[in-house]
Every structure is written in structure tokens, then in C-alpha cells.
Amino acid sequence: MWFKNLTVYRFNKPFSVDTEALEKSLEDFTFSPCSSQDISKFGFSNALGKQGQTLVHSASERHLICATKEEKILPSQVIKEALEDKVAQIEAEEDRKLAKKEKDAMKEEIVMTLLPRAFTRRSQIRALIIPEIEMILVDSSSAAKSEELLALLRKALGSLPIIPLSFKTPIETQLTEWLKGNSTPAPFIMQDEAELKTDSDEGGIVRFKQQDLTEDEVLAHIEVGKQVHKLALYFGQSIAFLLQSDAGIKRLKFSEEFRAGNDEVGTEDPMARLDADFALMGSELIALMNSLVEVLGGVEDSI
């Protein structure tokens, strides 16, 4: 339930699909396990996992969705060795060298033979659609995995007018100014971790962890042209996270004190607790994103 990373997108046009329509749209793209000849399968699953019964979980017009991916595990070395053995056998029997086209066809046959016996692994990825702030927050640090989920959502809805979150002023410019001035705008508080680098490909990268970022050693790197591309921050007393210059948020962690706000709900009714946690998390993520947009100078205008 509690998101651990954020890859953020914003809508170009208002999102006006209600819960019922969204649920119906996702139904045609629900997850099903791999058959014997499938390499992978990807589809929407219950938003709240085993406790849930719907593909969309909504509260206060915030929509949680989840997609499941199942992949067959076929080690490349196993395929390579099987192919080499098969090629060697045929070339010896026929006294000729096989063409690349023949080898490629042989490789496909080997893969299809191995698929029914292959182990599988599953992974899930969730996203929170928040029309209130015109954003989609994907619980992933991978842009590729986020795009895979959003491509499936776009296919289900017919269209999905979104772009990656970006700001009018480069994030690294703002973070560098904060570090130079040893000051972050409220309610953000600087932690003890940062990554600095130059804009040129030849420039170096320096990382600081568990270190006072106001020390001369850190500031000296800024003086010679490096900029802050990653900075660990606190959002008040509720969230710790690592902000990146590409607007990605990693290592998102809600404090124990904040999560304890739902302790009175108890755990006797799992669905009630999940509902409460979803509401608590959603409200705080909205507050976080609104505050980030404000202190980072506003989002970049849509093209």
C-alpha cells in the first residue's frame, strides 16, 4: 500500500473518468498467468491485492490501480549452450556452416521447447491517479516500468494525455541554491545526503552520505561548477525521500509517527485499515507534490 518511489506524470487535459467507467475500461485488460507458450503476461489486477475485489480502489476521487507482470525465467546462458550444441551437431552431420537465419530459427525453437518447463516470477506496479492535482504518481523508480503501466492504461482508456513532470526552473539549479545557502524552504528539511556533478560528460560525480552538507568540502564542489542532482530531504515530520533532478523521487518513506495516525482503526478489519491507510497516504502525497511544485518554481508549461 505505502508507495516507496514516485515517477510523476501530469495531465495535459483534465482527467474526468469516474470510478465505474475506469473499472469497466480496465476489465478487458485484466491479468492472467502465462500459458505454456507465453514468455510474459501483463495486465491489471486487484488494486488492494488479495484483500481487494476491484481493479480500481477509489476514495475522494483518487484512484489506485495495480498491474501484475508474470515472466518466464529463461537464462540466456542455457539458451546459448543449447543452441551451440544443436548447431555443432547439424553442422557436423551435414558438413556445412549454418546461416544466421537458420541459427535464429533454431534459437526460437529452443526457446519454445524450454518455455513450458521454465520457472516464472511475478512483479506488481501501482499508480495513483489524482485528478485534484492533475497528476499520476507511479510507485516505481524505473521510467521504463512506469511507461509500461501507463501504456496499458492508455490502451484501456483509448487515450491518456500525460507528460512527465518537469519544472520551469531546472531542479538542479534550485537544489544547488538551497545547498549554497544552507537553507530549504519550509516545510522541507535537508538531510545528510547529496550527489553533485557537472553538466559536461567529462565532468566528475561526487556523492556525500551521512555528512554535514554545509561543510567547506561540499561547497567547494559547487564553486568549481558542480550542481546538485540528488538531495535527500524531509517533508515536515511525515516523509523522507531523495529528490532527483529528473523530478523522480526515490526511497520514499513515511515516518512511523505519521503512519501511526491510523492506529485507532486497528487491524481487525483489514479492508478498513487499507482504506484508512490509502486515505492517509493519498492526502500526504498531494500535500508533498503541491509543496514541491511551489518551492521548485512551478511546473513547465505544456507544449
Swiss-Prot record:
**Subcellular localization(s) per the UniProt record:** Cytoplasm, Nucleoid
Keywords linked to the UniProt accession: Cytoplasm, DNA recombination
Q: What is its main location?
A: cytoplasm
Q: Does the keyword Heme apply?
A: no
Q: Which family does it belong to?
A: Belongs to the RdgC family.
What this protein is reported to do is described as: May be involved in recombination.
Descriptive protein name: Recombination-associated protein RdgC
- Species of origin reads Shewanella sediminis (strain HAW-EB3)
Query: Which gene name does the record give?
Result: rdgC
